[in-house]
A protein has these predicted regions:
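Residue-level recognition of beta-strand->loop/alpha-helix junctions
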Residues: 37, 86-88, 145
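Small/aliphatic-rich secondary-structure junction motif
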Residues: 3-52, 74-83, 149, 156-157
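A short acidic, glycine-rich active-site loop
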Residues: 53-66
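Short, flexible loop segments at boundaries between secondary-structure elements
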Residues: 141-151
């Protein structure tokens, strides 16, 4: 049923769980998995004048390389055919839009995202990204709640 599966990764526990679920789906459907890390330039450029935006972008790219190395090891260990890629937002584009563009570029037929990403300047906020992505998605979406979200929901019940 699925041939190309995209998983958005940012190094958070939620995105690692999304990768695990994406790998299960890829094995089940013998699909190719694409792990994607997005550098959100728009958030980083808002610090211009106080911090060097180019240095911040390079730092996020460096983080992306580390996150994707881990994803590559996980994909290889699972025995799934997969690729990893760092992509960057364009001026005026948010992370959800960039992921939608990636979906169209790579004929993705299932997108997998964690519901809670890393917070702060060194990450692209996947929690709100997941919601925006879901609203505009051109393909089926699997949202994966992280352990922290599950624990909080159970504690609140």
């Amino acid at each position: 049923m699925y041939t190309n599966i995209m998983v958005a990764v940012d190094g958070s526990a939620s995105s690692r769980q999304a990768l695990d679920e994406g790998l299960k789906m890829a094995r089940l459907h013998r699909a190719r998995l694409f792990a994607v890390f997005v550098v959100d330039k728009s958030i980083l450029l808002s610090y211009a004048g106080r911090l060097d935006p180019n240095a911040l972008i390079e730092e996020v790219r460096h983080d992306g390389v580390a996150v994707l190395r881990d994803a590559e090891r996980t994909i290889a260990h699972a025995g799934v055919n997969g690729d990893t890629e760092i992509v960057e937002t364009e001026l005026g584009q948010d992370v959800a839009e960039r992921l939608q563009h990636y979906v169209a570029e790579h004929a993705i037929d299932l997108a997998v995202l964690g519901t809670h990403g890393r917070r702060g300047i060194r990450r692209a906020m996947l929690g709100s990204v997941a919601e925006r992505f879901l609203r505009t998605s051109i393909c089926p979406v699997l949202l994966v709640r992280g352990d922290d979200a599950t624990r909080a929901a159970v504690a609140a019940a």
